[in-house]
């Protein structure tokens, strides 16, 4: 079986000057592909809509559907519920039940069990994401013909078996269109489409910039296992940091996590702003994750619109401040291992939360 180290040998390191250029600010009307697990929750829809309503600032080449799945949560939740039903002690809870304790307790208080939770498989997640992308295009009054592509229905099985899909081929074709400049892939989910494209065509790293949101800052001491975008496809996640593709890393925890919005804000600035405003309002007030995680009184709580950070970085440098660092190793346990001798990576350290949402609100005012 091909190891990560062996797979990386197929990639020719970029000249440092070209890497620096690719990690600089995008030029006018940059070419963009959005790779999104759109139906995973409700944040991707905001990001896709914002991009569709901002086509005077970016050239949105297409949107590719990424798979998602919560199967990796299933065993932990079942074990947590069983432990609580058996009256496990605190030591047992800490070592065995772990991060699923709160979820399990809320489910039980709601009169439900782990059997009541749907754990979709990646192929179902991809299909739902594809259908959701079409709904967002329609709500924005934009034709999807020739611009929405089906993605991988599984996570990368091995480094010698990239998953062929419309999405992976579209990424390759756009990256090889070098006459039109680099293409920025705004990756908002797990990375099988991107990882497969890179493995199928290692030459594309000279004209591709991966803008990905996931995980903790690269200087964090924590395991990135809590990150849904990162943990689902570990092979592709590790490949991104090793292969030398220009990478703008947008940490979810502590950075993107600031992008919260409340019910009153939704009511005042989003609801009634065209068909897409009403659709985003519907998603917010019928958030499927409220039921899934047994969240009570959702009207008193905000929700993180994580994935708008990708579009924000594309549109305005002031929206997402960054610093130049080196690409860390992501080890098998999903911890960062820093190495100052590595190739460069651009990393976000903050967001201008209010300015970002104000931009979205202005765009919604123009929605059909």
Regions found by a protein language model. Name each.
Residues 2-32, 46-62, 89-90, 228-231, ...:
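Conformational coupling and interaction surfaces
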Residues 85-116, 125, 132, 136-147:
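A glycine-rich helix N-cap at a beta->alpha junction
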């Amino acid at each position: 079986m091909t190891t990560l180290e062996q797979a990386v040998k197929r990639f020719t390191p970029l000249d440092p000057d070209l890497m620096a250029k690719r990690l600089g600010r995008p030029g006018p009307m940059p070419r963009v592909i959005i790779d999104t697990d759109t139906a995973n929750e409700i944040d991707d829809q905001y990001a896709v809509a914002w991009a569709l309503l901002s086509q005077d600032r970016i050239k949105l080449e297409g949107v590719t559907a990424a798979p998602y799945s919560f199967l990796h949560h299933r065993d932990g939740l079942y074990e947590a519920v069983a432990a609580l039903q058996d009256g496990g002690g605190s030591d047992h809870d800490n070592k065995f039940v772990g991060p699923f304790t709160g979820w399990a307790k809320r489910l039980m208080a709601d009169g439900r069990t782990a059997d009541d939770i749907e754990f979709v498989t990646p192929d179902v997640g991809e299909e739902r994401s594809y259908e959701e992308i079409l709904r967002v295009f329609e709500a924005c009054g934009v034709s999807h013909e020739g611009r929405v592509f089906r993605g991988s229905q599984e996570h990368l099985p091995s480094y010698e078996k990239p998953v062929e899909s419309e999405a992976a081929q579209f990424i390759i074709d756009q990256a090889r269109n070098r006459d039109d400049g680099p293409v920025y892939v705004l990756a908002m989910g797990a990375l099988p489409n991107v990882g497969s494209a890179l493995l199928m065509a290692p030459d594309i790293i000279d004209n591709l910039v991966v803008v990905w949101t996931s995980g903790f800052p690269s200087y964090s001491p924590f395991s990135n296992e809590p990150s849904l975008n990162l943990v689902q496809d570990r092979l592709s996640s590790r490949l991104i940091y090793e292969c030398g593709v220009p990478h703008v890393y947008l940490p979810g925890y502590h950075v993107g996590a600031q992008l919260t919005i409340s019910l009153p804000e939704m009511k005042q600035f989003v609801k009634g702003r065209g068909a897409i405003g009403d659709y985003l309002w519907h998603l917010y007030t019928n958030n499927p994750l409220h039921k899934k995680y047994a969240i009570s009184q959702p009207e008193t709580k905000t929700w993180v619109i994580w994935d708008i950070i990708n579009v924000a970085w594309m549109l305005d440098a002031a929206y997402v401040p960054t610093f130049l660092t080196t690409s860390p190793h992501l080890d098998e346990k999903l911890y960062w291992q820093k190495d100052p001798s590595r190739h460069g990576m651009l990393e976000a350290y903050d967001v201008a939360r209010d300015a970002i949402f104000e931009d979205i609100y202005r765009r919604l005012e123009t929605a059909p």
